[in-house]
């Protein structure tokens, strides 16, 4: 197996070539990748089936197997997301601001690539493509280290992308994959400050915290999704039912699904039996606080641990609250700062929720399932940042750049 340092050196060297490419040259390379993926769908599915079979033998949950799965529809969606990124404006080289100083010099900021991005992710082979496409379009090299549960899928996708780059201006070395399943390789990777400019972990909260604790490389935290919907006493019941079902059961294994439901006490007796019936039609397990248990008598008592847990499964915990203030306090205590929603007709309550809830994305009368790069018009995302510095929310092209000061003069010297 190729030495880790050699791979990182090649990635670093490729960034100098990437920095000189224009938008058309980068888009042509992305188009070649999209075409090669589309041409090799059957081959990708065959390799993905190996991962699924091995996962079933290991006893992986349905939720994790769903994350690993690549079928024709999902692969065509990946191709479409590449086409969407091609259409997006290239942020590299954009002058963010320019001002003339009293001495005549022009001082501005220019968007430039970050450099080498390492993405460390669990069982989501689509991330292999999404991360690569966004990195290359924004002028960055990418180092991919996916989960061993999706290793065959990740390798075939990487090989197909590198093959596509062979006849383009983007060097193949700009895409590197770390195939070793050993955890020690991740720890070694995260010490490589000479070669890696930023690391982006994607996975469980425990996994992300582990990466942040051991890394010397700067890390952008992409949080787990312990997301809530709060139903205010004035909410439209039909709207609330539709949003809750979509946010919980459409794809429970993703980070923008909801895990908790908060309901105002004044509507709990009327609303809870209805929404619980809806949820149980999809075999969702109901857990609840003491007040919930008085209304939904066969619900499972929720523990303190439940309020912190991202289930990624057909499970939901319900809490009855006395007020919007209690709802906000509960959310800010237990959430992962990902996506939160309120269902209400009251503009002032909606505004209060928007201002006071600490999350990367806060919704009024809409499903949290929209927290996604494609849905936000970013084409795709390399991750959803839940921290407050550099980037917050879905990270697209702009978030994979930084700025440098550029200064134009006509011979000025400092007096």
Curated annotation (Swiss-Prot):
GO cellular component: cytoplasm
A Gene Ontology molecular function term of the record: glutamate-5-semialdehyde dehydrogenase activity
Broadest EC class assigned to this enzyme: oxidoreductase
Keywords from the named record: Amino-acid biosynthesis, Cytoplasm, NADP, Oxidoreductase, Proline biosynthesis
Protein localization: Cytoplasm
Chief location of this protein within or outside the cell: cytoplasm
UniProt cross-references to SUPFAM superfamilies, sorted A to Z: ALDH-like
Catalytically driven reaction(s): L-glutamate 5-semialdehyde + phosphate + NADP(+) = L-glutamyl 5-phosphate + NADPH + H(+)
Associated pathway: Amino-acid biosynthesis; L-proline biosynthesis; L-glutamate 5-semialdehyde from L-glutamate: step 2/2
Its EC number(s): 1.2.1.41
InterPro entries assigned to the protein according to its UniProt record, in alphabetical order: Ald_DH/histidinol_DH, Ald_DH_C, Ald_DH_N, Aldehyde_DH_dom, G-glutamylP_reductase_CS, Glu-5-SA_DH, GPR_dom
Any GO BP: L-proline biosynthetic process
HAMAP family in the record: ProA
Role according to the record: Catalyzes the NADPH-dependent reduction of L-glutamate 5-phosphate into L-glutamate 5-semialdehyde and phosphate. The product spontaneously undergoes cyclization to form 1-pyrroline-5-carboxylate.
Family in the record: Belongs to the gamma-glutamyl phosphate reductase family.
Protein name stated in the entry: Gamma-glutamyl phosphate reductase
UniProt gene name: proA
